[in-house]
């Protein structure tokens, strides 16, 4: 095909110059370096690591994670986050780990995109829209972080801070439509 037409075979490939091991270095080695540096200047400090729900892996349908399950990450991102958790647990400082899910609220641009699309009457979802999700409001996560860093009962524990209700991506799409005053067409986007 013609160059730039989008037709025919690709003539090259895009590469951002980032390698998988670089991501591991940030999540694992970066967390360890910070813990060691803080340990040198403030050996009694508490390390509060913000990880990700992806480190835990998926829950069984209809059964949200409790936090006591062994981690089973299924993505490279989740495995990187788990590697960071492991070095913090083995590190020199008392620790607390939080595994937040999707965060929404002030300054969030990802969920904001869904609201903008809903204003046009469109709400994309992956697959059939039955993917179960959990979320936390940004200011609620901030409160959880403060509690994790100050409560004497949190040391050595891993928390899954989230809204107690699990919802589907289709329900989220319809709820966003309601919030912007539109009936939305929920469009199924193929999962990759």
Enumerate the language-model features and the residues they cover.
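NAD(P)H-binding glycine-rich loop region in Rossmannoid oxidoreductase-like domains
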Residues: 1-29, 55-58
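Glycine-rich NAD(P)-binding loop of the Rossmann-fold in SDR/ketoreductase-type enzymes
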Residues: 22-33, 79-80, 136
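Conserved Rossmann-fold NAD(P)-dependent oxidoreductase catalytic core, especially the SDR/UDP-sugar
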Residues: 32-76, 96
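Conserved beta-loop-beta element that borders a ligand/cofactor-binding pocket
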Residues: 85-106
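Substrate-positioning beta->alpha
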Residues: 109-113, 127-150, 156-160, 171
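Alpha-helical membrane-targeting segments
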Residues: 113-138, 183-192
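Mid/C-terminal beta-alpha module of Rossmann-like enzyme folds, strongest
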Residues: 148-192
């Amino acid at each position: 095909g013609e160059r730039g037409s989008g037709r025919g075979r690709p003539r090259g490939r895009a590469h951002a110059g980032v390698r998988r091991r670089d991501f591991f270095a940030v999540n694992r080695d970066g967390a360890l370096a910070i813990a060691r540096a803080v340990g040198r200047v403030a050996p009694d400090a508490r390390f509060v690591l913000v990880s990700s729900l992806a480190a835990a892996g998926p829950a069984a349908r209809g059964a949200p994670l409790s936090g006591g399950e062994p981690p089973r990450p299924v993505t490279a991102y989740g495995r990187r986050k788990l590697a960071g958790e492991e070095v913090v647990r083995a590190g020199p400082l008392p620790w607390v780990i939080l595994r937040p899910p999707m965060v929404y609220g002030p300054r969030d641009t990802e969920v904001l995109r869904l609201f903008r699309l809903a204003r046009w009457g469109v709400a994309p979802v992956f697959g059939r829209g039955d993917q179960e999700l959990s979320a936390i409001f940004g200011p609620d996560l901030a409160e959880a972080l403060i509690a994790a860093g100050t409560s004497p009962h949190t040391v050595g524990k891993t928390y899954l801070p989230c809204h107690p209700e699990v919802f589907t991506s289709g329900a989220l799409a319809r709820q966003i439509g309601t919030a912007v005053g539109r009936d939305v067409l929920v469009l199924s986007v193929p999962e990759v």
